[in-house]
Amino acid sequence: MASYLKLKAQEETWLQRHSRLILAILAGLGSLLTAYLTYTKLTEQPAAFCTGDGGCDLVLSSRWAEFLGIPTAAVGLLGFLGVLALAVLPDGLPLVKRWRWPALFGLVSAMTAFEMYMLYLMVAVLRQFCMYCTTAIILVAGLGLVTVLGHRWLDGGKLAFSYILVAFLTLVTTIGVYANQVPPPSPLAVGLAAHLRQIGGTMYGAYWCPHCQDQKELFGAAFDQVPYVECSPNGPGTPQAQECTEAGITSYPTWIINGRTYTGVRSLEALAVASGYPLEEGR
């Protein structure tokens, strides 16, 4: 009886028997999805079913849509292709049988941490729903579950420690990369921001507006000194903030400088002229 129970315990579950196939299917779907998003980003075409006034279009056009100068979707594509390769490679190849599952676990752990950060940005920072991003997150979560449950791991404690370590390193690297993607402000941006604050020149915008993000990026970190009014604190389609309504704001971004209204993204030089800031002081 004892030997029979031991034999039953050693039998593979249905998930363990089919885990590589399931991983290949999930990774294949993820590869197709991220390849499509990479294509739309590189060709500057809108993704299907995305509108220009909210949702996935705003997420996919945000500054987090690029990572180290390439589309963030391309990073996901590399991850999914890596999982696909590890899932389908035959055991007969050198080192594959021994290192397949440790490599899968490390790669999927990194992908999971990266996607969780993307989820945080989507929910807490951009506050927009992106069906493509959500689908990618679900696929990566599926890869994580199958990787953990679809293989007989000998040391659960070591596995948990490894995940924490990989996730920590991935998050630190990701946050560091995005933090350094914002260039230091130019002397013109610093001086102009201080001047706008002094004269009360104000930008009216919305956190979900991609053109507002473009305007902010022209200032870089100096934008923190620019007077700014958030006109849509509750998201697209909700009532405008009273201060914006009273100011007659109808589009974003809008500047009101010295009593005059300027709509759309404006260069730093144009804002300097409008506000009376001497350009030579910012050189």
UniProtKB/Swiss-Prot annotation:
**Keywords, sorted A to Z:** Disulfide bond, Membrane, Oxidoreductase, Quinone, Redox-active center, Transmembrane, Transmembrane helix
Q: Recall the GO molecular function terms of this protein's record.
A: oxidoreductase activity; quinone binding
Where is the protein found, in the record's own terms?
A: Membrane
What is stated about the way this protein's activity is regulated? Inhibited by ferulenol.
**Residue ranges crossing the lipid bilayer per the database entry:** 21-41, 67-87, 103-123, 129-149, 159-179
Residues given in the record as a quinone binding sites:
59-65, 111-122
Q: Where is this region: Thioredoxin-like domain?
A: 186-283
Q: What is its main location?
A: membrane
Function recorded in the entry: Thiol-disulfide oxidoreductase that catalyzes vitamin K-dependent disulfide bond formation in periplasmic target proteins.
The record comments on the domains as follows:
Cysteine residues from the thioredoxin-like domain participate in a series of disulfide-exchange reactions that regenerate the redox-active cysteine residues in the transmembrane domain.
Keyword Transmembrane helix in annotation? yes
Q: How does it sit in the membrane?
A: Multi-pass membrane protein
* Record-listed E.C. numbers: 1.17.4.-
Please give the name of this protein: Vitamin K epoxide reductase homolog
Describe the effect of residue 209 to A: Abolishes enzyme activity, but not with dithiothreitol as in vitro reductant
**UniProt-reported outcome of changing residue 50 to A:** Abolishes enzyme activity, but not with dithiothreitol as in vitro reductant
What pairs make up the disulfide bonds?
Answer: 50-56, 130-133, 209-212, 231-244
> Organism, per UniProt?
Synechococcus sp. (strain JA-2-3B'a(2-13))
User: One Gene Ontology cellular component annotation?
Assistant: membrane
Q: Which residues lie on this side of the membrane: Periplasmic?
A: 42-66, 124-128, 180-283
Q: What is the lineage of its organism?
A: Bacteria, Bacillati, Cyanobacteriota, Cyanophyceae, Synechococcales
Site keyed Important for the reduction of the redox-active Cys-130 and Cys-133: positions: 50, 56, 209, 212
